[in-house]
Every structure is written in C-alpha cells, then in structure tokens.
Regions:
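P-loop NTP-binding/switch modules centered on Walker-like glycine-rich loops
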Residues: 71-72, 191-195, 199-280
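Short catalytic/signature loops enriched in Gly
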Residues: 13-18, 156-160, 250-337
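A short, proline-enriched helix->beta-strand linker immediately N-terminal to the Walker B motif
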Residues: 184-188
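ABC ATPase NBD coupling module
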Residues: 76, 90-107, 125, 133, ...
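A short, flexible loop at the N-terminus of ABC-type nucleotide-binding domains that lies
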Residues: 15-19, 28-41, 72-78, 94-97, ...
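Conserved ABC ATPase "signature" region
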Residues: 88-89, 141-160, 269-270
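Conserved ABC transporter NBD signature motif
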Residues: 79-89
Length: 337
C-alpha cells in the first residue's frame, strides 16, 4: 500500500463558479547568460472552494507560477499571458491595485515561516497590523479578531500566544500563525508554497487537516505548490504536473494518481516509498532536471524518459485525451500502463 493510497481523499466541495482562469502564462528572466523561461505557456482554471495541486521537482516552475500571480517576481522577471481572477485581469496591475488585491482577495503562505515573520515584533502585533491597515479596525477590535483566527487554526492558548515572539514558537506553530495571517482578510484564493516542507510528518498531517477544515469553513480556493504527492492526495481536487516550466499532465487528482498518463507523472508516483515493498531500494527518475538555459530539443523530459522515441525530438503539444484531462506526450496512454 502506498502513502498515496492511505491518504485521506478530499471530500467533494460545493464549488460556485470560475474564480481563476490562467491562459498561456509565461515567465522569463533576463540573466547575463541569456533569457531563462521559467514558466512556459501554462493553462489552468480554479473554481471557488476548489484546490489545485501543482507538483514537480525543484526548478519546474511551481513557485514562479505563484509569484507571477501574486506580482512578486524578481526585478529581472517578465510576464506574459493572462490571469483572470473573479472576472478581472490581474497580471501587471498597478502597485496600488495589486496591494489591495493581495490584502483583500489573494493571500500566500510561504515555505519558511521563520523568515516570513518579523523576529523583532510580537506575533499579535503582526496579526493586528494586517487588520488595522487593510480592514480599518481599531487596536482592540484587531486584537480580538486575531485571537479568534488563532483559535480557528487550532493554536493552543491563543490569547497568551499573542504576546510571544516568533522564536518562542515551534515550526508547526509558526506555520499556523502564517495561515492565520493569510486568512485574516478572508481571501477568496490562498496560495500555499510548500507549506509543510520544513515540518515533521506529524505536524504536516495536522497542517493539511487544518487547511481542509478551513477550506470548507471559508469556501477558500487553494493552490497547493508541493513536491510531496502525499500532500496532494490528501487535499487537492485537481493536479497540474510541471517539468522545466511546462505542463506534462493536468486533470482530476484521482485520475492522475490512479491512471497517470505521462512518463514523468508515473516516475514521480513510482518514487513514493511503498509500505508493502520488499527490500530497501527506492525507485528514482534517472538523471536531473535540465538547465533552463540549455533545454533539450523537443520534449524536455526526453533525456530521462524510459519511453523516449525519435518523435520526441519535437515538442509534444498539450492535448485533451479524456474529459477534463490533458497531457503532453506522443506515447499512447495504453502503452504506458
């Protein structure tokens, strides 16, 4: 039995209309060695209350996708394509409008909570600042609302914790603070960039359970960026598999996990340790992700793919092969399974 098979499947959500529509998203960085395309013509949609998992190895473009949507690209970054949020184009918004959007509609949880919290400010002050700045609450009102949100994320002794500094919290508790801060303004979209990477497995499970509960309570859509397929299996409705900035596969989470249609997806799933496996050897994908300055001709996964053929020297188009499913591979699905 795999970790994926034992993970609790996400419950059916009550979705209520298209919230985010990303079309041909492209992120390019100018470097001394040339232009680097970190995200290459990405397409996906997200309904209200739905969770999308974006998975792939390091350097696949997952985080840059999130930074592009949040308007947080580095100074040398350039963005193309479109992203329509609640009927409004959000790419390249003026700074003032972008700040308002991030304050009221879209929030992000970053990978390392210790570097995201100000070590010189008490946690309560950092939470209250959000509400006083963006919601116009008084100090007393912001304090009580912050305590309520810490209670909502299962923070023990929430009122007492308001007076503590970040270094007095464990990693899991700091991440709960970050989740509370992200949800204070009741955003419609929450982007979580590797939110459990720095946590032990027990705390990971607690955080994922918490996100599931909060998703149901607030009907918040979530983009979950991770390399942990167990995390995706436990919370996500849909999965987008990325490699070298491109979509390899896209579809419902259950379909991708139980009937993967791309060699890269199969490789990622095979690399998950199995509880019933004999011996100590772990399966891996041979080789390393490509240098984005020197991508191989055609399919970027070709040099590592066990099913590579001559046709793969041309880039396969991303095509629909079943309802709600896309893949970029020339190999027939039946020949992969």
């Amino acid at each position: 039995m795999t970790m994926i098979e034992t993970a609790k499947a996400p419950q059916a959500q009550s979705h209520s209309g298209l919230l985010l529509d990303v079309k041909d998203l492209r992120v390019t960085f100018k470097t001394p060695d040339g232009d680097v395309t970190a995200v290459n013509d990405l397409n996906f949609t997200l309904q209200a209350g739905e969770t999308l998992g974006i998975v792939g190895e390091s350097g696949s473009g997952k985080s840059q996708t999130a930074f592009a949507l949040m308007g947080l690209l580095a100074a040398n970054g350039r963005i193309g394509g479109s992203a329509t949020f609640n009927g409004r184009q959000i790419l390249n918004l003026p700074e003032r409008e972008l700040n308002k959007l991030r304050a009221e509609q879209i929030s992000m949880i970053f990978q390392d909570p210790m570097t995201s919290l100000n070590p010189y400010m008490r946690v309560g002050e950092q939470l209250m600042e959000v509400l006083m700045l963006h919601k116009g609450l008084s100090k007393a009102e912001a304090f009580e609302e912050s305590v309520k949100m810490l209670d909502a994320v299962k923070m023990p002794e929430a009122r007492k914790r308001m007076k503590m500094f970040p270094h007095e919290f464990s990693g899991g508790m700091r991440q709960r603070v970050m989740i509370a801060m992200a949800l204070l303004c009741r955003p419609r979209l929450l982007i979580a960039d590797e939110p459990t990477t720095a946590l032990d497995v027990t705390v990971q499970a607690q955080i994922m359970t918490l996100l599931n509960e909060l998703k149901r309570e607030f009907n918040t859509a979530i983009i979950m960026i991770t390399h942990d397929l167990g995390v995706v299996a436990g919370i996500c409705d849909k999965v987008l598999v990325m490699y070298a900035g491109r979509t390899m596969e896209y579809g419902q989470a259950r379909d991708v996990f139980y009937q993967p249609s791309h060699p890269y997806s199969i490789g990622l799933l095979n690399a998950v340790p199995r509880l019933d496996a004999e011996g100590d050897a772990l399966l891996t994908i041979p080789g390393n992700p490509p240098n984005l300055l020197r991508l191989p001709k055609g399919c970027p996964f070709q040099p590592r793919c066990p099913h590579a053929m001559e046709q793969c020297s041309c880039a396969p188009p991303l095509e629909s092969f079943a309802p709600g499913r896309l893949r970029a591979c020339f190999k027939p699905v039946g020949d992969l399974l």
